[in-house]
Amino acid sequence: DSYSYPKANTSGCTAEACSLQAHKEELAATGYEIIGVSKDKQALQKKFAETKGLQFPLIADTETTLLQELGCWGEKVTCGRKTIGILRTTYLVNEEGVIEKIFTPKEIKTKIHAEQILDYIHQ
């Protein structure tokens, strides 16, 4: 389970990360590990993980190379304004490296995102 998030320590990203952390063991029991990716610098990622008690890896993709390859970097509308940035996306990748499901920005509800993932896995 890999997910991209726009910015550490913002309300939506914090809600999403905390949801995933709260259900980390349930996700692990189904064979999925959590990996977060954002454009934030490593120091901010570390502080975010420490202050929120996140016990999964956070990748600092400051050059957006991985984010672009994953299709998580592009045009979006924020507060009625078009910008280029991270598109909040989650990929469920199985043990063979095959993408089973992509949760798009329109599908993701940050506060209950882990439950959304578990619901999909258990359907």
Identify the role of each PLM range:
Residues 1-123:
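Chalcogenol-based redox active-site neighborhoods
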